[in-house]
Design a protein with these regions (language model features):
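Conserved structural position within tetratricopeptide repeats
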Residues: 69, 111-115, 145-149, 179-183, ...
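Alpha-helical segment of the N-proximal tetratricopeptide repeat
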Residues: 34-73, 88, 92-101, 112, ...
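Short coil turns that delineate tetratricopeptide repeat
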Residues: 72, 84, 118, 152, ...
Length: 315
């Protein structure tokens, strides 16, 4: 037994000798640190994504942010050198930040993604949607233009670009972009939803410009295409009828709006203005009361009368 122990000890020593002789070495503290960072990254990423799916956005943001820290990501560095796992975390983090309303931070993550994947159209679509919520129409235009360099015939990008133009007061380009979006969307069977969005915005814009006939054409198309009543479309038709001086028909469509959404404050407000213009003070007062119940913050500023164009007299 003593002899066997000596042999075992010798084997251990020989192994150590050969390891040193041939350049082998035990795992360094730096290697262990990297292994631990990789494990931390995976755990934090998994926990962050799971928290997102459970609607726990605060915890998701914390986990995903710490996952980037575990990877020792340089936020000021070149994102094009980041690996796919880091980019996936940025993608999830941008979504969580959007859900939380942290739009500027979400935009920063999307900007890093766009640096790493400049040919990914969907990144620019999301950037445009985020900047629209931020009301930063210049940045929104820039994001749309970047996306359209990748695909100039994307109907949704054209729709977003139109909204950016409208936000900057460029009505001519708004109509032009919407018209192009409609033509492209209507060529595709699956493009009906986008065509509806673009037609609705174009109809609303044309009506504001005083082009009642053009707005009516869009509204008629929408009413024909949609199987179920849509509040915004009914509201557009009501306003068109009012602009045409057809008060009773307009009231009929405001009634339909309220049937679809009993809490449509704007429908009560505008219908009340028509009742007042017709001399029906009883119904005008009822609509005004309904409107103020939904907007109690305006009650102190209202005298109780509506102007015919749909605005209440204020003190």
């Amino acid at each position: 037994m003593f002899f066997i122990k000596i042999i075992i000890d010798l084997n251990i020593d020989f192994m150590g000798f050969f390891k040193r002789f041939f350049g082998g070495k035990s795992e360094s503290s730096e290697d262990k640190k990297e292994d631990q960072s990789a494990k931390d990254f995976e755990v934090l990423k998994y926990d962050g994504v799971r928290a997102m799916h459970q609607g726990q956005m605060d915890y998701a943001i914390k986990c995903l942010t710490n996952a980037l820290l575990a990877k020792q990501v340089d936020e000021e560095g070149d994102a094009s050198k980041e690996d796919q796992e880091v980019l996936e975390v940025r993608d999830f983090l941008s979504l969580a930040l959007i859900q939380k309303g942290e739009l500027a931070q979400a935009y920063d993550q999307l900007r890093k993604l766009s640096e790493a994947q400049p040919d990914n159209k969907q990144i620019f679509v999301r950037m445009a949607e985020v900047t629209y919520m931020m009301e930063d129409y210049g940045a929104m235009s820039h994001a749309c233009e970047k996306g359209m360099l990748i695909d100039k015939d994307d109907a949704h990008l054209l729709f977003l670009y139109a909204k950016a133009c409208l936000g900057q007061g460029d009505v001519i380009n708004t109509i032009a972009m919407l018209t192009k979006s409609i033509l492209l969307a209507e060529k595709k069977q699956e493009g009906l939803a986008q065509a509806v969005q673009s037609r609705l915005l174009r109809g609303e814009t044309l009506l504001k410009l005083g082009d009642v006939k053009g707005a009516e054409e869009d509204a008629a198309w929408l009413l024909e295409q949609l199987e179920e009543p849509v509040e915004e479309v009914l509201l557009l038709e009501a306003r068109i009828l009012l602009a045409q001086g057809k008060m009773d028909d307009a009231i009929s469509y405001y009634n339909k709006v309220i049937d679809v959404n009993p809490f449509s404050a704007i429908a009560f407000k505008e219908r009340g203005a028509i009742y007042l213009a017709k001399g029906d003070k009883v119904n005008a007062e009822k609509d005004m009361q309904s409107y103020l119940e939904m907007n109690p913050q305006e009650a102190d500023a209202v005298t109780g009368e509506f102007k015919a164009e749909g605005k209440e007299h204020c003190r």
